[in-house]
């Protein structure tokens, strides 16, 4: 049977789904499978991946270090926007998928592949993030979405475990502990198994990059973070590359029990899902960045920018990273960051990330104006007319009652 697919590039993680998909693609399409794994900070999850992909049936595998690009071009732009989804989620997985899909398309072009493939389920957000990126960057490329393919005969993860065992496919997880985890420089997410019950407390053994607050040190840790135009550039005076800064900040914050989130979120496809996240470094950087802006950003600019945070987060969460409205929104955000330069001192203690100091050469804060002591620059009597003018509509409304 001629499927029209001779060569496909698969976004490969070595997890249950993509491990099975390699063999399934070969059986179903009779095609060559090129695996692509992006190093976005998942560390030990990449160990043995090359041998495993080839053993499973891939003709070759690309394993590329994209950590710097991920931090610089995806995490930091979202940080400049203070992006947070539904007031809780710092978008760790959402930001990684467009980068992985972009590089996957580039490899497909270079290899002359007919199609790209991913292992995201038909119920989740990642399918949308991958496929919107494919279409935005290579409109005519064929997309094989395994879970939505009519030839996909697996009904559950149990079916996939059976298939993997039949074909001697090694897996990083077991039937007894089938949590789905996704790790990068910004976070690690945990889903599935007992976590599907929103009443069940997450077991401590799922946490990977953060201590529990109870186990964190009894003394606080202080860290100073330098920013330049909204981007973190140094910790305690030592300049670091974007990826190195994220890694070190994760270590410091994780050791102090910071960044654990347990939330029920609204997926783009319409259902709710429960996710448990560890975002230690990102949690501290987000708080520090906002603290710096409190010094340097004009009030009305801040009000306007803050009104756009939910929209920015929604676009990123829903997979529209390469949409024209996202490009326009990022340009506006970056305009607000031109003077977001300075240093913020953070106190980290048992799960708490506390701002205890901030300074900037562009600070709009003036002790002369803000002091409660006697000053020479502000006549408090001027406030009388200001208040009466602002109360005018309230007084008129009261008179008409």
UniProtKB/Swiss-Prot annotation:
L-citrulline binds at residues 89, 94, 125, 129, 180, 189, 265, 277. The lineage of its organism: Bacteria, Pseudomonadati, Thermodesulfobacteriota, Syntrophia, Syntrophales. It comes from Syntrophus aciditrophicus (strain SB). This is Argininosuccinate synthase. NCBIfam families: argG, PRK00509.1. SUPFAM superfamilies: Adenine nucleotide alpha hydrolases-like, Argininosuccinate synthetase, C-terminal domain. L-aspartate binds at residues 121, 125-126. It is found in: Cytoplasm. GO terms for cellular component: cytoplasm. Its EC number is 6.3.4.5. Disulfide bonds: none annotated. Belongs to the argininosuccinate synthase family. Type 1 subfamily. The gene is argG. One of its GO terms (biological process) is argininosuccinate metabolic process. It catalyses: L-citrulline + L-aspartate + ATP = 2-(N(omega)-L-arginino)succinate + AMP + diphosphate + H(+). InterPro entries: Arginosuc_syn_C, Arginosuc_syn_N, Arginosuc_synth, Arginosuc_synth_CS, Arginosuc_synth_type_1_subfam, AS_cat/multimer_dom_body, Rossmann-like_a/b/a_fold. Keywords: Amino-acid biosynthesis, Arginine biosynthesis, ATP-binding, Cytoplasm, Ligase, Nucleotide-binding.
């Amino acid at each position: 049977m001629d499927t029209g697919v001779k060569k496909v590039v698969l976004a490969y993680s070595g997890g249950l789904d993509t491990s099975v998909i390699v063999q399934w693609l070969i059986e179903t399409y009779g095609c060559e499978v090129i695996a692509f794994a992006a190093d976005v900070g998942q560390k030990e999850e990449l160990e043995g991946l090359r041998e495993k992909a080839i053993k499973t049936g891939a003709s070759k595998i690309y394993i590329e270090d994209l950590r710097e690009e991920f931090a610089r071009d995806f995490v930091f732009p979202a940080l400049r926007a203070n992006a947070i989804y539904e007031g809780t989620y710092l978008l760790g997985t959402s930001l990684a998928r467009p980068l992985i899909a972009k590089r996957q398309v580039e490899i497909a072009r270079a290899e002359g592949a007919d199609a790209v493939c991913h292992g995201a389920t038909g119920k989740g957000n990642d399918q949308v993030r991958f496929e919107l990126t494919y279409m935005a960057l290579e409109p005519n490329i064929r997309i094989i979405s395994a879970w939505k393919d009519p030839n996909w005969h697996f009904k559950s993860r149990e079916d996939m475990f059976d298939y993997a065992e039949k074909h001697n496919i090694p897996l990083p997880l077991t039937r007894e502990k089938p949590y789905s985890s996704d790790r990068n420089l910004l976070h690690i997410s945990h889903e599935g198994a007992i976590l599907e019950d929103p009443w069940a407390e997450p077991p401590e053994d799922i946490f990977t990059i953060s201590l529990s607050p109870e186990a964190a040190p009894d003394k606080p840790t202080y860290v100073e973070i330098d920013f330049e135009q909204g981007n973190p550039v140094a910790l305690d005076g030592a300049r670091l590359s974007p990826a190195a800064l994220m890694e070190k900040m994760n270590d410091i914050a994780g050791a102090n029990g910071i960044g654990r989130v347990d939330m029920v979120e609204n997926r783009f496809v319409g259902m709710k899902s429960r996710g448990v996240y560890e975002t230690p470094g990102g949690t501290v950087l987000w708080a520090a960045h906002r603290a710096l802006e409190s010094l340097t950003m004009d009030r009305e600019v801040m009000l306007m920018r803050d009104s756009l945070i939910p929209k920015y987060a929604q676009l990123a969460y829903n997979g529209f990273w390469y949409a024209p409205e996202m490009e326009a929104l990022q340009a506006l955000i970056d305009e607000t960051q031109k003077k977001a330069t300075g240093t913020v001192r953070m106190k980290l203690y048992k799960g708490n990330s506390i701002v205890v100091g901030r300074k900037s050469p562009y600070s709009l804060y003036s002790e002369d104006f803000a002091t409660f002591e006697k000053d020479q620059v502000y006549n408090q009597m001027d406030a009388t007319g200001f208040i009466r003018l602002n109360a005018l509509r309230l007084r008129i409304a009261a008179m008409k009652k």
